[in-house]
């Protein structure tokens, strides 16, 4: 069984630095992700910026044989969508861009939702709710709280709005490795599960659906 790696204040400072660099990638992409761009161009622009401007490593590239630096998941694709030169963003689409970056030995992992052009009120409401649900989970984090407290906070906010939590995917510990312990579920019971302690670092990245929570997996080229 893998152990949870407790980070020192110095390690957390390095992780904050990696996170700040990743925020710069999204700030750059905010100007780039518009109607008419292909998801492969988003990938290529991000890779050039990470490597050339930030002198960092795209941590996803080569991980699990993944050949790209980010995932682009459009509309009903829950996560892990693959960039393509033929996938052009059109008005009305919602797209999640998920990027990892390593600097100084420590990895940052983040994603952002983009609404392309004019999206429907239903789509906008979904995007807003998943963001709010994520923050409900983040606000539950403190030493002495539990993973169940986080999951419950996310689940309650999403389900009160009529949405369902996707249960096949979860957050995770992060540090020198992209995926560390613990697994962070986005549903749960208050007071249940692992008790949080200072020095733990993990992601909270809920995925919610408008209707059923069910999702299916699709294979593309290679393992992706």
Predicted segments with their positions:
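Active-site neighborhoods and metal-handling regions in enzymes and metal-associated proteins
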Residues: 1-224
């Amino acid at each position: 069984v893998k152990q949870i790696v407790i980070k020192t204040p110095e390690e957390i400072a390095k992780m904050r630095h990696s996170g700040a660099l990743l925020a710069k990638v999204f700030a750059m992409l905010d100007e780039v992700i518009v109607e008419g761009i292909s998801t492969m161009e988003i990938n290529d622009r991000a890779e050039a910026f990470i490597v050339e401007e930030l002198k960092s490593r795209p941590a996803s590239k080569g991980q699990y044989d993944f050949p790209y630096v980010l995932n682009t998941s459009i509309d009903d694709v829950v996560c892990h969508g693959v960039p393509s030169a033929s996938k052009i963003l059109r008005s009305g689409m919602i797209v999640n861009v998920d990027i990892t970056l390593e600097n100084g030995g420590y990895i940052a992992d983040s994603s952002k939702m983009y609404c392309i052009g004019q999206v429907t009120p239903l789509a906008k409401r979904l995007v807003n709710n998943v963001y709010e649900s994520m923050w409900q989970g983040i606000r539950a984090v403190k030493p002495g709280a539990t993973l169940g407290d986080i999951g419950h906070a996310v689940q309650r906010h999403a389900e009160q709005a009529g949405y369902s939590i996707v249960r096949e995917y979860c957050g995770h510990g992060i540090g020198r490795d992209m995926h560390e312990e613990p697994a962070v579920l986005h549903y749960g019971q208050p007071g249940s599960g692992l008790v949080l302690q200072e020095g733990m670092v993990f992601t909270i990245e809920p995925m919610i659906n408008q209707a059923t929570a069910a999702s299916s997996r699709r294979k593309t080229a290679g393992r992706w």
